[in-house]
Protein backbone atom coordinates (compact mmCIF):
# COMPACT_ATOMS: atom_id res chain seq x y z
CA UNK A 1 0.00 0.00 0.00
CA UNK A 2 2.80 2.45 0.93
CA UNK A 3 4.67 1.66 -2.32
CA UNK A 4 1.50 2.31 -4.33
CA UNK A 5 1.02 5.71 -2.64
CA UNK A 6 4.69 6.59 -3.32
CA UNK A 7 4.30 5.75 -7.01
CA UNK A 8 1.02 7.69 -7.20
CA UNK A 9 2.67 10.69 -5.51
CA UNK A 10 5.16 10.88 -8.39
CA UNK A 11 2.29 11.54 -10.83
CA UNK A 12 1.15 15.22 -10.63
CA UNK A 13 -2.55 14.51 -11.28
CA UNK A 14 -2.72 11.76 -8.66
CA UNK A 15 -0.73 13.89 -6.23
CA UNK A 16 -3.44 16.56 -6.48
CA UNK A 17 -6.11 13.93 -5.85
CA UNK A 18 -4.26 12.60 -2.80
CA UNK A 19 -3.76 16.10 -1.36
CA UNK A 20 -7.43 16.95 -1.99
CA UNK A 21 -8.56 13.75 -0.23
CA UNK A 22 -6.25 14.48 2.72
CA UNK A 23 -7.61 18.05 3.04
CA UNK A 24 -11.22 16.82 3.06
CA UNK A 25 -10.35 14.28 5.76
CA UNK A 26 -8.66 17.05 7.77
CA UNK A 27 -11.87 19.10 7.60
CA UNK A 28 -13.78 15.99 8.70
CA UNK A 29 -11.51 15.59 11.74
CA UNK A 30 -11.86 19.29 12.63
CA UNK A 31 -15.66 19.01 12.42
CA UNK A 32 -15.51 15.97 14.70
CA UNK A 33 -14.03 18.22 17.40
CA UNK A 34 -16.73 20.95 17.28
CA UNK A 35 -19.53 20.12 19.78
CA UNK A 36 -23.10 21.31 19.35
CA UNK A 37 -24.30 23.78 22.02
CA UNK A 38 -26.46 23.00 25.08
CA UNK A 39 -24.94 19.53 25.65
CA UNK A 40 -23.07 18.39 28.76
CA UNK A 41 -20.38 16.38 26.98
CA UNK A 42 -18.97 14.95 30.23
CA UNK A 43 -22.32 13.42 31.23
CA UNK A 44 -22.85 12.19 27.67
CA UNK A 45 -19.39 10.59 27.59
CA UNK A 46 -19.97 8.84 30.93
CA UNK A 47 -23.35 7.55 29.76
CA UNK A 48 -22.08 6.25 26.41
CA UNK A 49 -19.00 4.68 28.03
CA UNK A 50 -21.41 2.38 29.89
CA UNK A 51 -22.91 1.44 26.50
CA UNK A 52 -19.61 1.18 24.61
CA UNK A 53 -20.24 -2.44 23.63
CA UNK A 54 -23.79 -1.81 22.37
CA UNK A 55 -25.07 -0.47 19.07
CA UNK A 56 -24.40 3.10 20.29
CA UNK A 57 -20.75 2.17 20.84
CA UNK A 58 -20.62 0.95 17.25
CA UNK A 59 -22.15 4.23 16.07
CA UNK A 60 -19.44 6.06 18.00
CA UNK A 61 -16.68 4.04 16.32
CA UNK A 62 -18.19 4.60 12.86
CA UNK A 63 -18.37 8.37 13.44
CA UNK A 64 -14.77 8.58 14.65
CA UNK A 65 -15.76 9.36 18.24
CA UNK A 66 -18.03 12.27 17.23
CA UNK A 67 -21.19 10.53 18.47
CA UNK A 68 -19.99 10.33 22.11
CA UNK A 69 -18.99 14.01 22.03
CA UNK A 70 -22.19 15.23 20.30
CA UNK A 71 -20.23 17.16 17.67
CA UNK A 72 -21.71 18.61 14.50
CA UNK A 73 -20.62 15.45 12.62
CA UNK A 74 -22.09 13.09 15.24
CA UNK A 75 -24.42 11.36 12.76
CA UNK A 76 -21.50 10.77 10.37
CA UNK A 77 -22.23 8.89 7.15
CA UNK A 78 -25.05 6.73 8.55
CA UNK A 79 -27.93 8.83 7.11
CA UNK A 80 -26.33 8.70 3.65
CA UNK A 81 -25.73 4.94 3.87
CA UNK A 82 -29.33 4.33 4.96
CA UNK A 83 -30.75 6.56 2.21
CA UNK A 84 -28.56 4.82 -0.41
CA UNK A 85 -29.96 1.44 0.66
CA UNK A 86 -33.55 2.68 0.48
CA UNK A 87 -33.17 4.36 -2.93
CA UNK A 88 -31.34 1.40 -4.48
CA UNK A 89 -34.05 -0.99 -3.28
CA UNK A 90 -36.77 1.38 -4.55
CA UNK A 91 -34.97 1.52 -7.91
CA UNK A 92 -35.65 -2.20 -8.29
CA UNK A 93 -39.22 -2.03 -6.93
CA UNK A 94 -40.41 1.07 -8.86
CA UNK A 95 -40.27 0.74 -12.70
CA UNK A 96 -39.97 4.51 -13.26
CA UNK A 97 -36.86 4.71 -11.08
CA UNK A 98 -35.42 1.60 -12.73
CA UNK A 99 -35.86 3.14 -16.20
CA UNK A 100 -34.30 6.37 -14.95
CA UNK A 101 -31.26 4.49 -13.63
CA UNK A 102 -30.80 2.18 -16.65
CA UNK A 103 -31.81 4.34 -19.59
CA UNK A 104 -31.34 7.87 -18.30
CA UNK A 105 -27.57 7.92 -18.73
CA UNK A 106 -25.66 10.59 -16.83
CA UNK A 107 -28.81 12.68 -16.41
CA UNK A 108 -30.63 9.73 -14.85
CA UNK A 109 -27.75 9.07 -12.46
CA UNK A 110 -27.80 12.73 -11.39
CA UNK A 111 -31.54 12.54 -10.66
CA UNK A 112 -31.08 9.36 -8.59
CA UNK A 113 -28.23 11.04 -6.72
CA UNK A 114 -30.43 14.08 -6.07
CA UNK A 115 -33.20 11.86 -4.67
CA UNK A 116 -30.62 10.13 -2.45
CA UNK A 117 -29.52 13.53 -1.09
CA UNK A 118 -33.08 14.49 -0.16
CA UNK A 119 -33.57 11.08 1.49
CA UNK A 120 -30.32 11.62 3.43
CA UNK A 121 -31.63 14.91 4.84
CA UNK A 122 -34.95 13.27 5.78
CA UNK A 123 -33.19 10.42 7.62
CA UNK A 124 -30.82 12.92 9.28
CA UNK A 125 -33.88 14.78 10.62
CA UNK A 126 -35.21 11.55 12.19
CA UNK A 127 -31.83 10.50 13.61
CA UNK A 128 -31.07 14.03 14.83
CA UNK A 129 -34.38 14.17 16.64
CA UNK A 130 -33.76 10.69 18.08
CA UNK A 131 -30.33 11.69 19.39
CA UNK A 132 -31.82 14.85 20.92
CA UNK A 133 -34.55 12.75 22.57
CA UNK A 134 -31.90 10.37 23.96
CA UNK A 135 -29.96 13.22 25.56
CA UNK A 136 -33.15 14.86 26.84
CA UNK A 137 -34.43 11.63 28.44
CA UNK A 138 -31.21 11.12 30.41
CA UNK A 139 -30.76 14.75 31.53
CA UNK A 140 -27.67 15.38 29.43
CA UNK A 141 -28.82 18.76 28.03
CA UNK A 142 -28.06 22.05 29.75
CA UNK A 143 -31.11 23.65 28.13
CA UNK A 144 -34.33 21.83 27.21
CA UNK A 145 -36.17 24.73 25.57
CA UNK A 146 -37.56 24.77 22.03
CA UNK A 147 -34.75 27.00 20.76
CA UNK A 148 -32.11 24.63 22.16
CA UNK A 149 -33.85 21.64 20.56
CA UNK A 150 -33.98 23.43 17.21
CA UNK A 151 -30.30 24.42 17.34
CA UNK A 152 -29.15 20.90 18.31
CA UNK A 153 -31.23 19.06 15.69
CA UNK A 154 -30.41 21.53 12.88
CA UNK A 155 -26.69 21.26 13.78
CA UNK A 156 -26.85 17.47 13.43
CA UNK A 157 -28.73 17.73 10.10
CA UNK A 158 -26.32 20.33 8.69
CA UNK A 159 -23.31 18.30 9.84
CA UNK A 160 -24.61 15.11 8.25
CA UNK A 161 -25.39 16.94 4.99
CA UNK A 162 -21.89 18.42 4.96
CA UNK A 163 -20.32 14.99 5.53
CA UNK A 164 -22.35 13.68 2.57
CA UNK A 165 -21.08 16.59 0.44
CA UNK A 166 -17.47 15.90 1.47
CA UNK A 167 -17.88 12.25 0.50
CA UNK A 168 -19.17 13.24 -2.94
CA UNK A 169 -16.24 15.63 -3.42
CA UNK A 170 -13.73 12.86 -2.62
CA UNK A 171 -15.47 10.52 -5.08
CA UNK A 172 -15.38 13.16 -7.84
CA UNK A 173 -12.04 14.89 -7.25
CA UNK A 174 -10.15 12.57 -4.90
CA UNK A 175 -9.26 8.89 -4.67
CA UNK A 176 -11.72 6.03 -4.13
CA UNK A 177 -15.29 6.03 -2.80
CA UNK A 178 -15.70 9.16 -0.68
CA UNK A 179 -18.20 7.79 1.85
CA UNK A 180 -16.08 4.66 2.39
CA UNK A 181 -12.94 6.80 2.82
CA UNK A 182 -14.66 8.97 5.47
CA UNK A 183 -15.90 5.85 7.25
CA UNK A 184 -12.37 4.42 7.06
CA UNK A 185 -10.87 7.61 8.53
CA UNK A 186 -13.42 7.70 11.35
CA UNK A 187 -12.79 4.11 12.41
CA UNK A 188 -9.01 4.48 12.11
CA UNK A 189 -9.07 7.52 14.40
CA UNK A 190 -10.54 5.33 17.16
CA UNK A 191 -7.71 2.76 17.05
CA UNK A 192 -5.52 4.52 19.68
CA UNK A 193 -8.50 4.76 22.03
CA UNK A 194 -9.38 1.07 21.56
CA UNK A 195 -5.74 0.04 22.16
CA UNK A 196 -5.67 2.25 25.26
CA UNK A 197 -8.85 0.65 26.61
CA UNK A 198 -7.40 -2.83 26.10
CA UNK A 199 -4.14 -1.83 27.83
CA UNK A 200 -6.08 -0.37 30.76
CA UNK A 201 -8.17 -3.55 31.01
CA UNK A 202 -4.97 -5.64 31.14
CA UNK A 203 -3.52 -3.46 33.90
CA UNK A 204 -6.65 -3.62 36.05
CA UNK A 205 -7.11 -7.35 35.46
CA UNK A 206 -10.47 -6.95 33.70
CA UNK A 207 -8.95 -8.75 30.70
CA UNK A 208 -6.65 -11.76 30.91
CA UNK A 209 -3.43 -11.73 28.89
CA UNK A 210 -4.54 -14.76 26.86
CA UNK A 211 -7.66 -12.84 25.80
CA UNK A 212 -5.50 -9.96 24.58
CA UNK A 213 -3.30 -12.41 22.63
CA UNK A 214 -6.45 -13.97 21.15
CA UNK A 215 -7.76 -10.55 20.08
CA UNK A 216 -4.47 -9.52 18.42
CA UNK A 217 -4.04 -12.92 16.72
CA UNK A 218 -7.65 -12.80 15.52
CA UNK A 219 -7.21 -9.32 14.04
CA UNK A 220 -4.00 -10.35 12.23
CA UNK A 221 -5.66 -13.52 10.89
CA UNK A 222 -8.62 -11.43 9.74
CA UNK A 223 -6.35 -9.02 7.87
CA UNK A 224 -4.53 -11.90 6.12
CA UNK A 225 -7.81 -13.63 5.19
CA UNK A 226 -9.44 -10.47 3.83
CA UNK A 227 -6.35 -9.60 1.79
CA UNK A 228 -6.11 -13.12 0.34
CA UNK A 229 -9.78 -13.46 -0.60
CA UNK A 230 -9.86 -9.93 -2.02
CA UNK A 231 -7.48 -11.03 -4.79
CA UNK A 232 -9.22 -14.35 -5.50
CA UNK A 233 -11.17 -14.63 -8.73
CA UNK A 234 -12.80 -17.19 -11.04
CA UNK A 235 -11.58 -16.89 -14.63
CA UNK A 236 -13.83 -18.01 -17.47
CA UNK A 237 -11.88 -18.81 -20.69
CA UNK A 238 -12.88 -16.70 -23.70
CA UNK A 239 -11.82 -17.19 -27.33
CA UNK A 240 -12.13 -14.72 -30.19
CA UNK A 241 -12.95 -15.88 -33.71
CA UNK A 242 -10.49 -15.08 -36.49
CA UNK A 243 -11.62 -12.55 -39.08
CA UNK A 244 -9.89 -11.27 -42.19
CA UNK A 245 -9.78 -7.56 -43.01
CA UNK A 246 -8.08 -7.05 -46.37
CA UNK A 247 -4.94 -9.16 -46.33
CA UNK A 248 -4.59 -9.13 -42.55
CA UNK A 249 -6.02 -11.69 -40.14
CA UNK A 250 -7.38 -10.40 -36.82
CA UNK A 251 -8.63 -12.20 -33.72
CA UNK A 252 -8.06 -15.79 -32.78
CA UNK A 253 -6.77 -14.79 -29.36
CA UNK A 254 -7.46 -16.52 -26.06
CA UNK A 255 -8.50 -14.44 -23.06
CA UNK A 256 -10.32 -14.78 -19.75
CA UNK A 257 -13.35 -13.20 -18.15
CA UNK A 258 -12.36 -12.52 -14.50
CA UNK A 259 -15.04 -12.80 -11.82
CA UNK A 260 -13.93 -11.68 -8.35
CA UNK A 261 -14.99 -13.83 -5.39
CA UNK A 262 -15.63 -10.75 -3.25
CA UNK A 263 -17.05 -8.61 -6.02
CA UNK A 264 -18.92 -6.12 -3.80
CA UNK A 265 -16.09 -5.43 -1.34
CA UNK A 266 -17.22 -4.25 2.09
CA UNK A 267 -20.48 -2.66 0.88
CA UNK A 268 -22.65 -5.67 1.87
CA UNK A 269 -21.23 -5.54 5.43
CA UNK A 270 -21.73 -1.77 5.74
CA UNK A 271 -25.28 -1.89 4.38
CA UNK A 272 -26.28 -5.07 6.25
CA UNK A 273 -25.01 -3.55 9.47
CA UNK A 274 -27.08 -0.41 8.88
CA UNK A 275 -30.23 -2.49 8.35
CA UNK A 276 -29.54 -4.80 11.32
CA UNK A 277 -28.95 -1.81 13.60
CA UNK A 278 -32.29 -0.10 12.91
CA UNK A 279 -34.32 -1.72 15.72
CA UNK A 280 -31.47 -1.67 18.31
CA UNK A 281 -30.87 2.00 17.46
CA UNK A 282 -34.54 2.93 17.89
CA UNK A 283 -34.57 1.00 21.18
CA UNK A 284 -31.42 2.80 22.36
CA UNK A 285 -32.97 6.22 21.69
CA UNK A 286 -36.11 5.37 23.70
CA UNK A 287 -36.36 5.12 27.51
CA UNK A 288 -35.26 1.72 28.84
CA UNK A 289 -38.26 -0.66 29.22
CA UNK A 290 -38.98 -2.33 32.54
CA UNK A 291 -37.99 -5.95 33.16
CA UNK A 292 -40.65 -8.53 32.40
CA UNK A 293 -42.34 -6.42 29.70
CA UNK A 294 -42.61 -7.22 26.00
CA UNK A 295 -40.42 -4.21 25.20
CA UNK A 296 -37.65 -5.53 27.45
CA UNK A 297 -37.79 -8.97 25.78
CA UNK A 298 -37.75 -7.37 22.30
CA UNK A 299 -34.74 -5.17 23.13
CA UNK A 300 -32.78 -8.21 24.39
CA UNK A 301 -33.79 -10.25 21.32
CA UNK A 302 -32.45 -7.65 18.85
CA UNK A 303 -29.40 -6.63 20.87
CA UNK A 304 -26.13 -6.73 18.90
CA UNK A 305 -24.91 -9.58 21.14
CA UNK A 306 -28.00 -11.75 20.64
CA UNK A 307 -28.15 -14.83 18.39
CA UNK A 308 -31.19 -13.43 16.53
CA UNK A 309 -29.23 -10.28 15.62
CA UNK A 310 -26.31 -12.39 14.34
CA UNK A 311 -28.58 -14.56 12.17
CA UNK A 312 -30.36 -11.51 10.72
CA UNK A 313 -27.02 -9.76 10.13
CA UNK A 314 -25.64 -12.85 8.35
CA UNK A 315 -28.70 -13.15 6.08
CA UNK A 316 -28.57 -9.43 5.24
CA UNK A 317 -24.91 -9.76 4.19
CA UNK A 318 -25.78 -12.63 1.83
CA UNK A 319 -28.75 -10.70 0.41
CA UNK A 320 -26.73 -7.53 -0.23
CA UNK A 321 -23.85 -9.56 -1.72
CA UNK A 322 -26.21 -10.98 -4.37
CA UNK A 323 -27.84 -7.59 -4.82
CA UNK A 324 -24.57 -5.82 -5.64
CA UNK A 325 -23.19 -8.72 -7.69
CA UNK A 326 -26.18 -8.51 -10.06
CA UNK A 327 -25.76 -4.72 -10.34
CA UNK A 328 -22.02 -4.85 -11.08
CA UNK A 329 -21.95 -7.98 -13.26
CA UNK A 330 -24.79 -8.27 -15.79
CA UNK A 331 -24.56 -11.67 -17.60
CA UNK A 332 -26.81 -10.61 -20.50
CA UNK A 333 -24.84 -7.42 -21.13
CA UNK A 334 -21.50 -9.27 -20.97
CA UNK A 335 -22.80 -11.98 -23.32
CA UNK A 336 -23.94 -9.36 -25.84
CA UNK A 337 -20.58 -7.56 -25.67
CA UNK A 338 -18.72 -10.82 -26.30
CA UNK A 339 -20.96 -11.55 -29.28
CA UNK A 340 -20.41 -8.08 -30.77
CA UNK A 341 -16.63 -8.43 -30.47
CA UNK A 342 -16.55 -11.95 -31.91
CA UNK A 343 -15.83 -13.58 -28.56
CA UNK A 344 -17.31 -16.80 -27.21
CA UNK A 345 -16.93 -19.19 -24.29
CA UNK A 346 -15.81 -22.66 -25.50
CA UNK A 347 -18.67 -25.15 -25.35
CA UNK A 348 -21.45 -22.53 -25.27
CA UNK A 349 -23.25 -20.83 -28.14
CA UNK A 350 -23.23 -17.00 -28.19
CA UNK A 351 -26.32 -15.29 -26.81
CA UNK A 352 -28.63 -16.83 -24.23
CA UNK A 353 -26.60 -20.05 -23.56
CA UNK A 354 -23.53 -17.93 -22.80
CA UNK A 355 -25.54 -15.58 -20.56
CA UNK A 356 -27.04 -18.56 -18.69
CA UNK A 357 -23.59 -20.07 -18.13
CA UNK A 358 -22.15 -16.76 -16.88
CA UNK A 359 -25.15 -16.35 -14.56
CA UNK A 360 -24.66 -19.88 -13.20
CA UNK A 361 -20.97 -19.25 -12.47
CA UNK A 362 -21.80 -15.84 -11.00
CA UNK A 363 -24.32 -17.38 -8.58
CA UNK A 364 -21.78 -19.96 -7.38
CA UNK A 365 -18.97 -17.43 -6.96
CA UNK A 366 -21.29 -14.93 -5.24
CA UNK A 367 -22.56 -17.62 -2.86
CA UNK A 368 -19.01 -18.45 -1.80
CA UNK A 369 -18.14 -14.75 -1.46
CA UNK A 370 -21.33 -13.99 0.48
CA UNK A 371 -20.79 -16.86 2.93
CA UNK A 372 -17.17 -15.76 3.36
CA UNK A 373 -18.25 -12.18 4.14
CA UNK A 374 -20.97 -13.39 6.50
CA UNK A 375 -18.61 -15.71 8.41
CA UNK A 376 -15.90 -13.05 8.64
CA UNK A 377 -18.43 -10.53 9.98
CA UNK A 378 -20.11 -12.93 12.43
CA UNK A 379 -16.98 -14.64 13.76
CA UNK A 380 -15.82 -11.70 15.94
CA UNK A 381 -19.35 -11.41 17.35
CA UNK A 382 -19.39 -15.11 18.26
CA UNK A 383 -15.89 -15.09 19.76
CA UNK A 384 -16.72 -11.95 21.74
CA UNK A 385 -19.83 -13.64 23.09
CA UNK A 386 -18.01 -16.90 23.97
CA UNK A 387 -15.01 -15.33 25.74
CA UNK A 388 -17.18 -12.50 27.11
CA UNK A 389 -15.14 -9.75 25.45
CA UNK A 390 -17.90 -7.63 23.93
CA UNK A 391 -15.46 -5.02 22.59
CA UNK A 392 -14.10 -7.68 20.22
CA UNK A 393 -17.36 -7.63 18.25
CA UNK A 394 -17.04 -3.92 17.53
CA UNK A 395 -13.29 -4.20 16.87
CA UNK A 396 -13.79 -7.11 14.46
CA UNK A 397 -16.37 -5.26 12.36
CA UNK A 398 -14.12 -2.20 12.29
CA UNK A 399 -11.13 -4.25 11.09
CA UNK A 400 -13.18 -5.73 8.24
CA UNK A 401 -14.28 -2.29 7.03
CA UNK A 402 -10.84 -0.68 7.43
CA UNK A 403 -8.96 -3.45 5.58
CA UNK A 404 -11.62 -3.71 2.88
CA UNK A 405 -11.69 0.04 2.19
CA UNK A 406 -7.86 0.21 2.23
CA UNK A 407 -7.61 -2.56 -0.39
CA UNK A 408 -10.30 -0.97 -2.57
CA UNK A 409 -8.56 2.42 -2.39
CA UNK A 410 -5.21 0.89 -3.37
CA UNK A 411 -6.90 -0.81 -6.34
CA UNK A 412 -8.44 2.53 -7.36
CA UNK A 413 -4.98 4.14 -7.22
CA UNK A 414 -3.41 1.33 -9.24
CA UNK A 415 -6.13 1.49 -11.91
CA UNK A 416 -5.68 5.27 -12.24
CA UNK A 417 -1.90 4.86 -12.55
CA UNK A 418 -2.39 2.20 -15.24
CA UNK A 419 -4.85 4.40 -17.10
CA UNK A 420 -2.37 7.29 -17.14
CA UNK A 421 0.41 5.00 -18.38
CA UNK A 422 -1.74 3.99 -21.36
CA UNK A 423 -2.73 7.63 -21.89
CA UNK A 424 0.93 8.69 -21.98
CA UNK A 425 1.76 5.86 -24.39
CA UNK A 426 -1.03 6.87 -26.78
CA UNK A 427 -0.05 10.54 -26.66
Predicted feature residues:
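N-terminal cationic and glycine-rich segments that engage phosphates or anionic surfaces
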Residues: 1-427
